[in-house]
């Protein structure tokens, strides 16, 4: 009395005085369960990716906001720095003071430094505002997509 498995059916052999039970339904292949598991895992990875992208957009917006605040305060410090440059200009050697000209190299250097610094800071400020707007827009769109 041995039992032998058959590929599509499961037969249980019992002693001769007991009834023979057979299973007519086909068992579910294990590949289908694995495919379902793969689909679920891929969906979970996609959801995690969307949430991490949303978090990245929010962090980008916050860092742009901090940069905007810092860059807004910096141009206010340009005038005291320019004044300091002009005060340092008066400490030049006495031989140059005799032929003092408004357009001396020291004065021109102060103006060039102030102009280049103001231009750089204003460009950084505009770029930071643009980054902030894009990051907020991206975060809002991703948030609406996940909800």
UniProtKB/Swiss-Prot annotation:
Record-level GO BP terms: cell surface receptor signaling pathway
Membrane topology: Multi-pass membrane protein
Keywords: Membrane, Receptor, Transmembrane, Transmembrane helix
Transmembrane segments: 53-73, 121-141
Main location group: membrane
Keyword Flavoprotein on entry: no
Cellular-component GO terms for this entry: plasma membrane; trans-Golgi network
Residues in compartment: Cytoplasmic: 1-52, 142-147
Subcellular location: Membrane
Top-level taxonomic group: Eukaryota
InterPro entries linked to this entry: CD20-like
Extracellular-side segments: 74-120
Tissue expression profile of the protein: Expressed by malignant and fetal tissue at very low levels.
Function: May be involved in signal transduction as a component of a multimeric receptor complex.
Family in the record: Belongs to the MS4A family.
Name of protein: Membrane-spanning 4-domains subfamily A member 6E
Species this chain originates from: Homo sapiens
Lineage: Eukaryota, Metazoa, Chordata, Craniata, Vertebrata
């Amino acid at each position: 009395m041995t039992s032998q498995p058959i590929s599509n059916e499961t037969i249980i052999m019992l002693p001769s005085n007991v009834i023979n039970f057979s299973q007519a339904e086909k068992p579910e292949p294990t590949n289908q369960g694995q495919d379902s598991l793969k689909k679920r895992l891929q969906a979970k990875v996609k959801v995690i990716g969307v949430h991490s992208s949303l978090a990245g957009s929010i962090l980008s917006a916050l860092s742009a906001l901090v940069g905007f605040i810092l860059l807004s305060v910096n141009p206010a410090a340009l005038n005291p720095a320019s004044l300091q440059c002009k005060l340092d200009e008066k400490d030049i050697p006495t031989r140059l003071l005799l032929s003092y000209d408004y357009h001396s190299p020291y004065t021109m250097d102060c103006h060039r430094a102030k102009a280049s610094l103001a231009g750089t800071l204003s460009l950084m400020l505009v770029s930071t505002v643009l980054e902030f707007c894009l990051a907020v827009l991206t975060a809002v769109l991703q948030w609406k997509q996940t909800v």
